UniProtKB/Swiss-Prot annotation:
InterPro entries: Ribosomal_uL6-like, Ribosomal_uL6-like_a/b-dom_sf, Ribosomal_uL6_a/b-dom, Ribosomal_uL6_CS2. Keywords: Phosphoprotein, Ribonucleoprotein, Ribosomal protein. The modification Phosphothreonine is found at T75. This is Large ribosomal subunit protein uL6z/uL6y. It comes from Arabidopsis thaliana. The gene is RPL9B.
Length: 194
């Protein structure tokens, strides 16, 4: 069965400007600018004004959509909400080094754009991970064996964490016993809400 029209709207904060052009959404805020392409989705994007409050809203329509297309409306809204959160508050992921015997040494180079991991499970191999665009990495001052990744795009920050995590993957051993690695310990925003 097809639904004739399913649509949803979301409020846009005053500190953020949004441009919609041919399913490409550009969000600009105090922390910078992010662009996302929704051309693969069969949806209509419009910027509207609320008649009562006069606030800007983003409206997404799906004409004659199947259940999958109707479900993609909510997905697109969530992506745009993440873009708005990114340009207003930013995303921060904290990762901790976990080791039983051999302490993991990590040195951050390239102005916070890459990390080199040494002495993982006592190996001599140096593992180098480049951060994705717009993601910076620093060592935590307060907590020992912790690194902090900051960025505006949640997908790039979380993918950078995944790259670090995958570099420290234990091979040819029982991972229930050998728990060494670098794991995400906390996810938060850079600018906390008052």
């Amino acid at each position: 069965m097809k639904t004739i029209l399913s649509s949803e709207t979301m409020d846009i904060p005053d500190s953020v400007t949004i441009k919609v052009h041919a399913k490409v959404i550009e969000v600009e805020g105090p922390r910078g600018k992010l662009v996302r392409d929704f051309k693969h989705l069969n949806l209509d994007f419009q910027l509207i004004k609320d008649p009562e409050t006069g606030k800007k809203k983003l409206k997404i329509d799906s004409w004659f959509g199947t259940r999958k297309t109707s479900a993609s409306i909510r997905t697109a809204l969530s992506h745009v909400d993440n873009l708005i959160s990114g340009v207003t508050r930013g995303f921060r992921y904290k990762m901790r080094f976990v080791y039983a015997h051999f302490p993991i040494n990590a040195s951050i180079g390239g102005d916070g754009k890459s990390i080199e991991i040494r002495n993982f499970l006592g190996e001599k191999k140096v593992r180098k991970v480049e951060m994705l665009d717009g993601v910076t990495i620093v060592r935590s001052e307060k907590v020992k064996d912790e690194i902090v990744l900051d960025g505006n795009d949640i997908e790039l920050v979380s993918r950078s964490c995944a790259l670090i995590n995958q570099k420290c993957h234990v091979k040819k051993k029982d991972i229930r016993k050998f728990l060494d690695g670098i794991y995400v310990s906390e996810k938060s925003k850079i600018v906390e809400e008052e």
